[in-house]
C-alpha cells in the first residue's frame, strides 16, 4: 500500500467513525421496528399471514437464497397476481436489509483501514477515537444480532425478490449478496468471531485501556461510601475547588456501555483471554455484574449462555467455560444485592447533592463533574434494574424489586432541572476557566512539544486562540456559543496523532491528550449542557418497558413515603422523544403518542389519588360537622335536665357520650389518628403535583395542577349531589340546613388544599356551585337545584294539596296535620325560615329563579284549568257579574254554576304555591341582604321609586330585577311570563280579557260555599285555616295583577269589582238560617280582610264601603272566643 494511501488526514477516520456510528443507531432503530412489526399480528405485513400465499412463502424460505421461478408455477401463481403490491409494500423492509448490508461493508472497510494504519487506542488519552471505535464495533455486533432475530427476514427478502423477478425478469441486483449475508449471519457472533481475527490487536488494545476506568467505576456501595463519593460537604475546605480528574470524560462514561464493550469485545477477540490476565480479569468482572445486557431498547442478550454456547465448540476453552459458569453463579448470587445497595447509596448521595446545589447553585461551576457523574451512575443503576426486572432469578427476587426507585429518578430530575435553570452560571464559570486557565496551560504544552507538524500546530493554535477570545460579556449578552467545530478538530487530531507513523504521536504525549479531554469537557459545559444531560441521564428506555414503568408508578403511589416523588414518572415522559432517530421518522408519531398517553395517565392517577384522599378528609370533616348540628344536643339537654331534677339518668356504668371536639385533645403526640395519616399522605402527594407548574411532552404542555382542579370539580359536584341523599323511591332528601353544613365543611377542606398546591380553589367553587344553580350540570346530570325543586313540588306541595300539610302564616312554615297515614317527613323541618335561607344559600339567585319558574309552571297549568271552567259557565257568570245587587237572581244563577268546589280548590292550590314562593323569596332576600347589602338596597330604591306613569315594560324590567333579589313586587313578573305563554291563537284578546274578568267573578261568588266546610275554621294560633283557604288572599291578588297586566286592564278596577261581588255574596250567608251552611261563616268573613291586607291595590276604606267593619270585628271576636273555648 502506497504512503499516500496511509496519510491519516486522507483517511478521515474521525469523520467516518462519527457518521457510521450515527448511521448505525439509525439502522438499529429501523431493524428494531421491523422486528416489532413482524412480532405483532396487527402490524405484520399481510403477505406473511395471507393463507393464499402461505405455500409460496414456505417454498421461498425453504429454497432461500436460491431463486426458482420456472418449475413452480402452481405455488407461485398467487404471487404473480400480487407482485406489484408486494413490491410496493415490502420495499421499505427490503431496502432496510440492503442498507444493513451496505453499513456492514463500510464498517468492515473502516476496520481494515484502522488495522492497516495501526491506530493506537487508549480510552484515557484519545478518548473520542477509542470510544467511537468501540461504539462502532458494538453497534455493528448488535445490528447483526438483531438482524438474526427477525424470523421473517428470509420470507420478506425472498418475497420481494420473487416479485421483482416476475416484474422485471431478473432478480434485484443486491439480492445475491444480501441473501448470502442473511445465510452467513444465521449465528452472528460465531461468524463475527471469525471475521474479527485480523482486528484482534486493535480491539484488544482498546479494551485493555479500560483497565484503569472500568474497575474504578464498578465498585461496591461500601467503597463509594468510604470514599465519600459525590459528596460536596465531606471536605468543606475544598468545596470551591474545581472537581478535576486526568480522565474527565471517563468519569461519567456509561457503565452499561463499558460492559457491552468488554463482553462483546472479548467474545470477538477471545484469543486474548488466554494470553492476557488483565483482559481476563476485565471480562470476568463484567460477567459477574449482570445476567443480561441491553442490546437495543428492550432487546436483551443473555451473556452467560451465549458465551458458553460459543466457546463450547472451541478446543482448549474448558477453562473459559468454567470461568463463565463461575461468573454466572456470582451474578445470580451477588449482583442483585450489590446493585440494590448502590441504588440505596445513590438515593442519599443525589439527595444531598440536589439539596446543596438548590441552596448554593454557584457550586454548579466547580462541581459540574459531580452532577454528571451522579446522573450517569444513577442512570446506569436504573437501566440495570429495568433490564433485569423481567429476567430476575427466583432466589433473590426481592433484590430486583425496588419500591424506592421513584426517589432516585426524582433526584435525577431535580439535578437536571438545576443544570437547565442555572446554565448561565455554569457558562460564566467555564468561559473564565477556558480563557484564563485552559488556554494558558495548553499553550505551554504546545510550546514544549519537541516535534509539532504544521497541520497539528495550526489546529492546536486555533484551540488556544478560540479559548483566549472568550469573555464573560458574551454570556451576559446572551451570545450563543458553538464549540462543535473545535471538538471535531480535536477528534481529527486524535486520529492524525494515533496512527503508527505519525510525526507527533499521542501515545508519547499523554499529558496533551488528557489536557485536551479536560478542555473538551469544559467546552461542553458552555454550549452543550442539554446534550450532556441526554448523554448522562436519558431514560427514554422506559418508553419500551411500559408494563414495568406503570408497575413502578403504582408501587410509588401505594407507598405514602414515596408518593411525593411520583412526579418523576410524568417527567420521564419528556425524555422519550430523544430516542427517535432521523433515519426512522415514522416512529416519531408512535413514540410521541405513547409519551403523551403515559404522561396523561400518570398525572390523571396522581390527581385521582389526591382527590380520593381529599374526599376521605372531607368525609371525616363532614362527620365532625354533623356532630355539631342542633339535633344532636337533645340528649345532652335531657341529661342536664334529669341531673338537675335529680332523676336517674339510666343504668349504672352507662358510658358517657363523647362530646364533639374530643378528637382534638391529644394526650400523647405519638398517637396518630386516621385524619393525621390522610393529611400526611395528601401533603406528600400534593408536593409532587405542585413540583412543576407545567411540562412539555412532544410539543404538548401538561399542567399537573389542572388535573387536580378538574378532578376536584367533578368530585365536588358528585359529592354535593350525593350529600342531598335524595331517594326517588321513598322521596327522602336531606334538610337544606344539613346539606349546607356539609357543603361548608367540604369547602373548608378544599380551601385548605391551597396550602399544599397552588391552585385556584375559588375557581373550583365558582364552576361547581354555579352549575348547581342550573337545572342540569355541564355533564347533563341533575343538580341540587333540580332535586330540591322536584322534591318541594312533587312531595311537599303535593301533600299540601292532599290536605296532609297546612301553611301556618304565624310560623312562616308548612306544618304536618294530624292524619291517619303519618308522613315520612316533617314539613316544618324543610320549610321554616332557617331551612329556606339554607336553601337560598345553596341554590343562589339562579337556582331560586328556576324554582320560581317551576312553581309558576304549575300555577299556569291550574289557571288553564280554571279558564276551562269559566268557559263552561261563561253565560251564567256574565249575568252574575251585572246582577250582584239582585240577591234573588244571584241565588238562582249560583245554583246553575258547575264546578264551584273545583275552582276554589284550584285557587287554594295556587295560593299555597304562591305562599311557598313568598317564603322562598323572603329567604333569598335575607341571604342576599347579608352577602350584598349595598346592591340589594340599590335594587329596593329602584323598585320603590317607579313613577306611576312609567311604561309597563320598563316597570316589569325593574320588577324582574327586584324579584331576582327576592323583593316582593306589586305584580309578579314570573307569574306574568308564565301566564303570557297561555295565550290561545283561537281566542281574541277581548275574549281572553273577558275570561279573566269572569274568573274573578267565579271566585268571588264561590267564596260563601267555604263556610260549610268543617276545615274552614280560622285558627288564631296559626293565623290561618287548616284547609289553607287563607292562601286564597295571595292567589286572588297575584292572579288578578298578572292577568290584567297581560290584558292591559285596570287591576284596581277589577279588584274593586271582585270585592263588591265577594262582599255581596258573603253578606248573604249572614241571613242564612241553616247552621250547616254557616258553621264557619265568621272564619270566611276574615278572608275579605286578608285579601285587602294582602293587596297593594285595595284599601280598608274601600272594604268598609262594601262590607261593614263591625261584621269583621265581630268575626274576629267570635273566632278567638271559639279558639279559647276549644283549647279549654
Curated annotation (Swiss-Prot):
The gene is NCKAP1. It is a single-pass membrane protein. Residues 640-665 are annotated as: Disordered. The chain crosses the membrane at residues 995-1015. The keyword Mitochondrion does not apply. Pfam families: Nckap1. Component of the WAVE1 complex composed of ABI2, CYFIP1 or CYFIP2, BRK1, NCKAP1 and WASF1/WAVE1. Within the complex, a heterodimer containing NCKAP1 and CYFIP1 interacts with a heterotrimer formed by WAVE1, ABI2 and BRK1. Component of the WAVE2 complex composed of ABI1, CYFIP1/SRA1, NCKAP1/NAP1 and WASF2/WAVE2. CYFIP2 binds to activated RAC1 which causes the complex to dissociate, releasing activated WASF1. The complex can also be activated by NCK1. Associates preferentially with the first SH3 domain of NCK. Interacts with NYAP1, NYAP2 and MYO16. Interacts with TMEM132D. It is found in: Cell membrane; Cell projection, Lamellipodium membrane. The lineage of its organism: Eukaryota, Metazoa, Chordata, Craniata, Vertebrata. This is Nck-associated protein 1. Residues 651-665 have a biased composition (Basic and acidic residues). GO terms for cellular component: cytosol; extracellular exosome; filamentous actin; focal adhesion; lamellipodium; lamellipodium membrane; postsynapse; ruffle. Part of the WAVE complex that regulates lamellipodia formation. The WAVE complex regulates actin filament reorganization via its interaction with the Arp2/3 complex. Actin remodeling activity is regulated by RAC1. As component of the WAVE1 complex, required for BDNF-NTRK2 endocytic trafficking and signaling from early endosomes. The modification N-acetylserine is found at residue 2. The keyword Ligase does not apply.
Amino acid at each position: 500500500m502506497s504512503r499516500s494511501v496511509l496519510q491519516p488526514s486522507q483517511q478521515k477516520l474521525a469523520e467516518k467513525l462519527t457518521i457510521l456510528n450515527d448511521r448505525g443507531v439509525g439502522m438499529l432503530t429501523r431493524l428494531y421496528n421491523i422486528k416489532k412489526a413482524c412480532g405483532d399480528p396487527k402490524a405484520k405485513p399481510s403477505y406473511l399471514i395471507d393463507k393464499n400465499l402461505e405455500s409460496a412463502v414456505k417454498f421461498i424460505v425453504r429454497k432461500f437464497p436460491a431463486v426458482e421461478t420456472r418449475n413452480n408455477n402452481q405455488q407461485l401463481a398467487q404471487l404473480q397476481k400480487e407482485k406489484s403490491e408486494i413490491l410496493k409494500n415490502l420495499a421499505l423492509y427490503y431496502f432496510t436489509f440492503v442498507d444493513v448490508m451496505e453499513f456492514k461493508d463500510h464498517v468492515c472497510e473502516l476496520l481494515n483501514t484502522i488495522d492497516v494504519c495501526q491506530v493506537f487506542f487508549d480510552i484515557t488519552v484519545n478518548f473520542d477515537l477509542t470510544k467511537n471505535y468501540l461504539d462502532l464495533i458494538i453497534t455493528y455486533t448488535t445490528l447483526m444480532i438483531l438482524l438474526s432475530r427477525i424470523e421473517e427476514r428470509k420470507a420478506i427478502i425472498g418475497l420481494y425478490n420473487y416479485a421483482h423477478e416476475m416484474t422485471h425478469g431478473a432478480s434485484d441486483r443486491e439480492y445475491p449478496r444480501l441473501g448470502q449475508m442473511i445465510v452467513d449471519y444465521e449465528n452472528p457472533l460465531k461468524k463475527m468471531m471469525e471475521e474479527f481475527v485480523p482486528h484482534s490487536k486493535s480491539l484488544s488494545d482498546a479494551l485493555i485501556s479500560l483497565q484503569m476506568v472500568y474497575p474504578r467505576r464498578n465498585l461496591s456501595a461500601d467503597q463509594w461510601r468510604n470514599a465519600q463519593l459525590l459528596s460536596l460537604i465531606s471536605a468543606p475546605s475544598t468545596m470551591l475547588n474545581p472537581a478535576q480528574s486526568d480522565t474527565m470524560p471517563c468519569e461519567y462514561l456509561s457503565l452499561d456501555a463499558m460492559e457491552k464493550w468488554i463482553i462483546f469485545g472479548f467474545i470477538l477477540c477471545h484469543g486474548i483471554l488466554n494470553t492476557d490476565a488483565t483482559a481476563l480479569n476485565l471480562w470476568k468482572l463484567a460477567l459477574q455484574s449482570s445476567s443480561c445486557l441491553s442490546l437495543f431498547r428492550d432487546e436483551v442478550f443473555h451473556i452467560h449462555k451465549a458465551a458458553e454456547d460459543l466457546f463450547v465448540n472451541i478446543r482448549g476453552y474448558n477453562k473459559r467455560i468454567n470461568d463463565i459458569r463461575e461468573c454466572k453463579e456470582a451474578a445470580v448470587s451477588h449482583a442483585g444485592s450489590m446493585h440494590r445497595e448502590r441504588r440505596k447509596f445513590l438515593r442519599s448521595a443525589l439527595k444531598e447533592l440536589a439539596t446543596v446545589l438548590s441552596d448554593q447553585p454557584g457550586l454548579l461551576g466547580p462541581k459540574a463533574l459531580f452532577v454528571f457523574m451522579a446522573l450517569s451512575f444513577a442512570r446506569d443503576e436504573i437501566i440495570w434494574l429495568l433490564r433485569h426486572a423481567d429476567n430476575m432469578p427466583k432466589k433473590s427476587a426481592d433484590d430486583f424489586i425496588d419500591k424506592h426507585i421513584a426517589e432516585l429518578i426524582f433526584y435525577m430530575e431535580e439535578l437536571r432541572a438545576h443544570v437547565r435553570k442555572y446554565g448561565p452560571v455554569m457558562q460564566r464559570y467555564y468561559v473564565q476557566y477556558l480563557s484564563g486557565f485552559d488556554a494558558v496551560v495548553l499553550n505551554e504544552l504546545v510550546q514544549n512539544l519537541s516535534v509539532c507538524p504544521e497541520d497539528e500546530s495550526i489546529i492546536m493554535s486555533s484551540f488556544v486562540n478560540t479559548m483566549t477570545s472568550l469573555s464573560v460579556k458574551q454570556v451576559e449578552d446572551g451570545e450563543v456559543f458553538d464549540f462543535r467545530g473545535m471538538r471535531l478538530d480535536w477528534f481529527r487530531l486524535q486520529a492524525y496523532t494515533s496512527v503508527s507513523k505519525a510525526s507527533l504521536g499521542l501515545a508519547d504525549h499523554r499529558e496533551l491528550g488528557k489536557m485536551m479531554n479536560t478542555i473538551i469537557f469544559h467546552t461542553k459545559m458552555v454550549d452543550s449542557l442539554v446534550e450532556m444531560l441526554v448523554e448522562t441521564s436519558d431514560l427514554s428506555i422506559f418508553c419500551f418497558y411500559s408494563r414495568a414503568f406503570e408497575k413502578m408508578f403504582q408501587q410509588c403511589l401505594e407507598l405514602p413515603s414515596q408518593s411525593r416523588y411520583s412526579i418523576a414518572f410524568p417527567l420521564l415522559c419528556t425524555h422519550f422523544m430523544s430516542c427517535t432517530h432521523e433515519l426512522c421518522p415514522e416512529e416519531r408519531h408512535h413514540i410521541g403518542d405513547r409519551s403523551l398517553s403515559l404522561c396523561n395517565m400518570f398525572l390523571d392517577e396522581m390527581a385521582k389519588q389526591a382527590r380520593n384522599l381529599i374526599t376521605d378528609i372531607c368525609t371525616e370533616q363532614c362527620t365532625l360537622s354533623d356532630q355539631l348540628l342542633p339535633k344532636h344536643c337533645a340528649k345532652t339537654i335531657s341529661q342536664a335536665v334529669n341531673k338537675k331534677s335529680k332523676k336517674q339518668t339510666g343504668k349504672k356504668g352507662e358510658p358517657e357520650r363523647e362530646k364533639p371536639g374530643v378528637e382534638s385533645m391529644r394526650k400523647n403526640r405519638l398517637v396518630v389518628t386516621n385524619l393525621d395519616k390522610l393529611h400526611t399522605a395528601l401533603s406528600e402527594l400534593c408536593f409532587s403535583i405542585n413540583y412543576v407548574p407545567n411540562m412539555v411532552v412532544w410539543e404538548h404542555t401538561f399542567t399537573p395542577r389542572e388535573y387536580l382542579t378538574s378532578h376536584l370539580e367533578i368530585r365536588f359536584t358528585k359529592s354535593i349531589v350525593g350529600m342531598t341523599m335524595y331517594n326517588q323511591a321513598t322521596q327522602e332528601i336531606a334538610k337544606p340546613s344539613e346539606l349546607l353544613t356539609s357543603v361548608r365543611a367540604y369547602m373548608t377542606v378544599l380551601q385548605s388544599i391551597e396550602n399544599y398546591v397552588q391552585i385556584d380553589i375559588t375557581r373550583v367553587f365558582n364552576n361547581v356551585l354555579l352549575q348547581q344553580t342550573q337545572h342540569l350540570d355541564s355533564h347533563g346530570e341533575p343538580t341540587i337545584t333540580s332535586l330540591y325543586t322536584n322534591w318541594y313540588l312533587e312531595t311537599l306541595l303535593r301533600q299540601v294539596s292532599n290536605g296532609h300539610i297546612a301553611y301556618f302564616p304565624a310560623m312562616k312554615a308548612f306544618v304536618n296535620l294530624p292524619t291517619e297515614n303519618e308522613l315520612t317527613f316533617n314539613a316544618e323541618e324543610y320549610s321554616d325560615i332557617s331551612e329556606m335561607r339554607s336553601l337560598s344559600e345553596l341554590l343562589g339567585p339562579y337556582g331560586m329563579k328556576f324554582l320560581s319558574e317551576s312553581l309558576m309552571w304549575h300555577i299556569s297549568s291550574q289557571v288553564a284549568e280554571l279558564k276551562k271552567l269559566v268557559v263552561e259557565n261563561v253565560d251564567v257568570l256574565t249575568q252574575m257579574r251585572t246582577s250582584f245587587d239582585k240577591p234573588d237572581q244571584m241565588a238562582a244563577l249560583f245554583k246553575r254554576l258547575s264546578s264551584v268546589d273545583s275552582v276554589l280548590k284550584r285557587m287554594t292550590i295556587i295560593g299555597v304555591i304562591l305562599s311557598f314562593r313568598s317564603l322562598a323569596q323572603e329567604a333569598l332576600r335575607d341571604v342576599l341582604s347579608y352577602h350584598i347589602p349595598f346592591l340589594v338596597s340599590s335594587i329596593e330604591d329602584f323598585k320603590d321609586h317607579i313613577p306611576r306613569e312609567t311604561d309597563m315594560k320598563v316597570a316589569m324590567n325593574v320588577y324582574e330585577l327586584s324579584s331576582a333579589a327576592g323583593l316582593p313586587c306589586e305584580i309578579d313578573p314570573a307569574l306574568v311570563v308564565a301566564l303570557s305563554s297561555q295565550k290561545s291563537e283561537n281566542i281574541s284578546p277581548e275574549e281572553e280579557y273577558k275570561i279573566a274578568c269572569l274568573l274573578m267573578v267565579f271566585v268571588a261568588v264561590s267564596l260563601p260555599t267555604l263556610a260549610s266546610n268543617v276545615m274552614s275554621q280560622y285558627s288564631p294560633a296559626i293565623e290561618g285555616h287548616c284547609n289553607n283557604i287563607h292562601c286564597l288572599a295571595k292567589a286572588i291578588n297575584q292572579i288578578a295583577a298578572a292577568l290584567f297586566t297581560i290584558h292591559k286592564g285596570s287591576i284596581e278596577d277589577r279588584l274593586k269589582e271582585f270585592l263588591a261581588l265577594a262582599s255581596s255574596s258573603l253578606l248573604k250567608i249572614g241571613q242564612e238560617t241553616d247552621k250547616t251552611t254557616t258553621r264557619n261563616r265568621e272564619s270566611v268573613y276574615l278572608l275579605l280582610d286578608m285579601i285587602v291586607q294582602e293587596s297593594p291595590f285595595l284599601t280598608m276604606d274601600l272594604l268598609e264601603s262594601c262590607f261593614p267593619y263591625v261584621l269583621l270585628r265581630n268575626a274576629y271576636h267570635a273566632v278567638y272566643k271559639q279558639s279559647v273555648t276549644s283549647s279549654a
